[in-house]
A protein has these predicted regions:
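Mg2+-dependent phosphoryl-transfer enzymes with acidic/Ser/Thr/Gly-rich catalytic loops
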Residues: 51, 187-245
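Substrate-recognition "cap/lid" segment bordering the active-site pocket of phosphatases
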Residues: 94, 100-119, 171-201
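Non-catalytic pre-domain segments flanking phosphatase-related domains
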Residues: 1-34, 38-42, 53, 194-195
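Charged, glycine-interspersed solvent-exposed loop segments at helix/strand-loop junctions
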Residues: 131-148, 167-180
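Residue-level signal for inorganic ion chemistry
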Residues: 36, 91, 142, 190, ...
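A common structural junction motif
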Residues: 125, 160-167
Length: 245
């Protein structure tokens, strides 16, 4: 497509089913959450299934947008690269704690000393088999999708353990609590991308499904772009579609 031409996603149900949404063009920069947006949510993080046409569709969109497409996710970098192999896209992983524009990943945040949080989460999971502890480079996530009745216990356990760690905050997602460095969020990751080519000078669009994506919606809309919320629930995003890829 020539500059200013249309890279139309409206016909591409493999990315999302557009529902009265503005048309994406080559003047846009596209940022996509992963879980719940490009894939359906699964009981465990490793159980996510990638639709057969998703990788070629993302590759095509990346080319049509002149490289201005990035995944912005809470997952570790290795997870995304594994699910989307052999495709390697620009990526902000762990909510922006790790940042990859081209081939080299740059840690944006130093790992905090999370041992007290990790120990508390692991001890709780050992007593309740439905819980899952996920250790990332700069954070600890406690998943309770298989034990939703333990939500309050998970929350209180992590809050108590966080008192022993400086510079962290609790992030609530869909059936998960995550202890991460304070100030690290998807909005900052998107803002950082927008200062660099090929993203700079474009209108940003961010698609996400979770409360963890609200900072991303705020960032793109502050930059004159638009957010798309996938699914139900309150949001500051200007647009909504009801289904993921």
């Amino acid at each position: 497509n020539p500059p200013g031409g249309r890279a139309c996603i409206a016909a591409s149900a493999m990315v999302w089913r557009m529902q009265l949404l503005p048309t994406l063009t080559t003047a846009h920069a596209l940022f996509l959450d992963f879980d719940g947006t490009l894939t359906e949510l699964a009981p465990r993080p490793e159980a996510v299934r990638v639709a057969s046409g998703l990788i070629p569709t993302l590759s095509s969109l990346h080319a049509q947008l002149g490289g201005a497409l990035a995944i912005v996710t809470g997952r570790p970098e290795a997870d995304i690269d594994g699910f989307l192999a052999p495709l390697r896209l620009p990526l902000a992983s762990e909510h922006g704690a790790q940042y990859r524009l081209f081939d080299t990943s740059v840690p944006a945040t130093a790992p905090p000393a999370l041992e007290p949080v990790l120990q508390a989460a692991q001890a709780l999971a050992a007593r309740h088999p439905g819980l899952l502890v996920e250790t990332k480079r700069v954070s600890v996530a406690l998943h309770y999708r298989l034990a939703p009745h333990l939500e309050s216990l998970c929350h209180d356990t992590l809050v108590q353990a966080m008192r022993e760690v400086d510079g962290v905050e609790l992030l609530r997602g869909k059936c998960v609590f995550e202890v991460k460095p304070r100030g690290v969020h998807k909005g900052q990751a998107i803002s950082d991308f927008m200062t660099q080519p090929p993203f700079a000078g474009r209108t940003p669009v961010f698609v996400g499904d979770d409360v963890t994506d609200e900072a991303g919606f705020a960032a793109v809309q502050a930059l004159g772009g638009w957010g798309i919320k996938v699914g139900e629930g309150p949001t500051m995003a200007q647009h909504r579609c009801m289904t993921s890829a």
